[in-house]
């Protein structure tokens, strides 16, 4: 079966990337990435077929990764932090659903160290109580939903 990895590269550079993510990158023929992440991981992706694009082209990158996989090329789409937390996983799953590709492509999502947890660790601020992570980006989320999420989290006294 054709394979598409959604690879978390951690909170930046090579310091937070998991061995499992490195193995997936090594196994992949094609790497799809935001240009900045590709530069940060240069030595790891050297010699691979590479598709990069700039900020705000997330949907196009996801569509291209799926297309490479459909062509039979083992593909890894990279995202910093954890792909499942404000990462590329949601977009990939939505596109896979839209095109009903679940019987055609094996999708493997690899978790990583979120930027939130890396920052908390560096600050010496362990997260030991209930907490909420609310993205303030209105790029793919309506600002009214962001406002509502913040209000509900504060009503519950979550650490934000």
How does the language model describe each region?
Residues 13, 87-158:
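Class I SAM-dependent methyltransferase SAM-binding "motif I" and its flanking Rossmann-like core
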Residues 1-110:
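Class I S-adenosyl-L-methionine
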